[in-house]
Amino acid sequence: DTLDFDYLIEHNKILLVNLSKGKIGETNAQMLGLIIMSKLQAAILKRAKIEPEKRSPYYLYVDEFQNLVTDTFASLLSESRKYGLGVHLTNQYFAQLPEKIKDAILGNVGTIIAFEIGMEDAEILSKEFEPFTKEDFTNLRKYNFYIRLMIDGKTSKAFSGESLKPNNISISNLTEEIIK
């Protein structure tokens, strides 16, 4: 059967896709990921027909998103807010990304959180996280982070925080519970 992305978005459904290169191979993971992203983008763009105040928010979470970046992904980032799409991206470091995508992220993303990073990324992010310096980023202790929030359309002053330490609960034991 096929996936109806319009239905998923309209009914706030969750789609989980495991694109593990180890399970399906690198080429298959990238191809499937790109197909899903293009279908999702087409469904998101159709929301232009819905009055803005009637668009319910929809959220896209992409881990290791550097594997799925295209030029159209940059345009999705720049237009996501007006279509009611919240985008949550994670990756390891900026060097994995084309320059156009880096610019799209820094120009359009409201909230950025960073844990300890290398000097090259610290050079980039310290400009976004004043008063924190590149040395502050490279010397963060385990579980500590810097964050810059978007609140009511305005960027907050960057601040530091400490995340909870992971507990020893196995996620695989909670899978059924999470899916419910």
Question: Can you annotate each of these PLM segments?
Answer:
Residues 17, 115, 161:
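Hydrophobic residues at beta-strand termini and immediately following loops
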Residues 1-85, 101, 139, 145-155:
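P-loop NTPase motor domains
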